Amino acid sequence: MFQVIQKELDFGNAMIPKVWIQVIKLNPSSSIFVWGSNVSTCPAGDLALSMPGKSDVVTTKLTGAGSIDDLSTQMSRILSKKFQAQVYTSINLQGDFPNDPEVQSVFTQVIRAVIEIIESSKSS
């Protein structure tokens, strides 16, 4: 059984593109898949995988046809630690990281939205 939740973030600013988010939760396991993009193509190919370990979060990259950046790894680690689950992520946000404060705020809003999606799906 799985649960699919999709959300579009609109920042109300024509200079900041909308972000499309999809979260898939596999039940009864604790695996979570997260895709996010603010460009015309959806992320595909590689995934960052994080799993909670005994003392830290273990992270690896699952290589596919595309490539991922540090954002995918960062989000995967944050979500894995918070929810004590296996988290697979592929995030494609336009802009330079982490030096662009405007785009960095988009990442912050995206991760908040993903956390909200996961928490609200627990109660339903």
From Swiss-Prot:
Please tell me one Gene Ontology term that the record gives under cellular component. nucleus
Keyword Nucleus tagged: yes
Provide a GO biological process annotation: proteasome assembly
Tell me, in one coarse class, where this protein mainly resides.
Answer: cytoplasm
User: Which of UniProt's keywords are assigned here?
Assistant: Cytoplasm, Nucleus
Record GO terms (molecular function): protein folding chaperone
State the name under which the record lists this protein. Answer: Uncharacterized protein C24B10.16c
Origin species? Schizosaccharomyces pombe (strain 972 / ATCC 24843)
